Swiss-Prot record:
GO terms for molecular function: N-acetyl-gamma-glutamyl-phosphate reductase activity; NAD binding; NADP+ binding. Belongs to the NAGSA dehydrogenase family. Type 1 subfamily. Pathway: Amino-acid biosynthesis; L-arginine biosynthesis; N(2)-acetyl-L-ornithine from L-glutamate: step 3/4. The active site is at C146. The gene is argC. This is N-acetyl-gamma-glutamyl-phosphate reductase. It is found in: Cytoplasm. CDD domains: AGPR_1_actinobacAGPR_like, AGPR_1_C. Its EC number is 1.2.1.38. Its main location: cytoplasm. SUPFAM superfamilies: Glyceraldehyde-3-phosphate dehydrogenase-like, C-terminal domain, NAD(P)-binding Rossmann-fold domains.
Length: 342
């Protein structure tokens, strides 16, 4: 019997990518599609690439519309998911693609998001130690942020093997879709094309506490993170360059061995052959993650680089992967590691 899924926030980039993936998922039947500001409009006018759903009409996001589904995906702006989720029954699998339930520390949430903390749900990054067990059978899932997905998958093997000191410096470039679909002057083509620019510098980006939370949990001690995000002139993709001070005695061989061990059985995270480097173009449209690692002996640092599609593995693909685990399906169901090139 098919799993009936509703999508709240179907008109945005994350909601559109989720629907693209669900259309080819063999176990999912797409139910209600909602979007408050676009209620009453045809989906085809807002997401013209989703031809099989073009004539579906968006409804208001209400408990009555979302009720009666096995799974409800919330692709809503940060701070809006909690009010919707509390109106859904405990037997409904609710997958929040926003930030509302990712952080464990209420102080971090209030400092970075400026509203009361709604709580914490099982975290939808299965590759982290212990995460799969928490997701299996769960009825509530918090999908990670796109930057924390890229950074955590790049660095967790080093911390799991106790190779890195508890401080990391991260510079990550993201495509413009990470900023959402709403019109913003700095995302105009004339502003973005042919240019790169940092933002959220000096610890101001909202994804910073999420990275600290993830890496600290793996390391078993607090990890200091300096994160500088950069806007890149491309629609989608993240390239994260992450460095951490190596502990005494660490070698290139020990680093490589730790990453090979940590990622050997992961269906979506691929450690590239030595000498080959991650590229956002290689994971475009897929749930794949490319990782490469190096040891800078002169500087005494571990350099881990990852590439993801921010809308796929970084959002919608991660949501589907986590849903699969919660429902007892193979976690790769409906997902691909095949990118689109050129």
């Amino acid at each position: 019997m098919a799993v009936r899924a509703a999508v709240a926030g179907a008109s945005g980039y994350a909601g559109g990518e989720l629907l693209r993936l669900l259309l080819t998922h063999p176990e999912v039947e797409i139910g209600a599609l909602t979007g408050n500001s676009n209620a009453g409009q045809r989906l085809g006018a807002l997401q013209p690439h989703l031809l099989p759903l073009a004539d579906r009409v968006l409804e208001a996001t209400t408990p009555e519309v979302l009720g009666g589904h096995d799974v409800v995906f919330l692709a809503l702006p940060h701070g809006q998911s909690a009010a919707v989720a509390e109106q859904l029954g405990p037997d409904v699998l609710v997958v929040d693609m926003g930030a509302d339930f990712r952080l464990k520390d209420a102080g971090d949430w209030e400092r970075f998001y400026g509203s009361p903390h709604a709580g914490t749900w099982p975290y939808g990054l299965p590759e982290l130690p212990g995460a799969r067990a928490a997701l299996e059978g769960s009825k509530r899932i918090a999908v990670p942020g796109c930057y924390p997905t890229a950074v955590s998958l790049a660095l967790f093997p080093a911390y799991a093997a106790s190779l890195a000191e508890p401080e990391a410096v991260i510079v990550a470039a993201s495509g413009t879709s990470g900023a959402g679909k709403a019109a913003k002057p700095h995302l105009l083509g004339s502003e973005v094309m042919g240019s790169m620019s940092p933002y959220g510098v000096g610890g101001g980006h909202r994804h910073t506490p999420e990275m600290i939370q993830n890496l600290g949990a793996v390391a078993g001690e607090p990890v200091t993170v300096s994160f500088t995000p950069t806007l890149a002139p491309m629609p989608r993709g993240i390239l994260a360059t992450c460095t951490a001070k190596a502990k005494p005695g660490v070698t290139a061989e020990s680093v490589r061995a730790a990453y090979e061990k940590a990622l050997a059985d992961e269906p979506f995270v691929h450690l590239l052959p030595e000498g080959q480097w991650p590229a956002t173009a290689s994971v475009y449209g897929s749930n794949a993650v490319q990782v490469q690692v190096a040891h800078d002996a002169a500087a005494g640092r571990i350099i881990a680089i990852s590439a993801i599609d921010n809308l796929a593995k970084g959002t919608a693909g991660g949501a589907v992967q986590s849903m699969n685990l919660a429902l007892g399906l193979d976690e790769t169901t409906g997902l691909t590691t095949i990118g689109v090139a050129p």
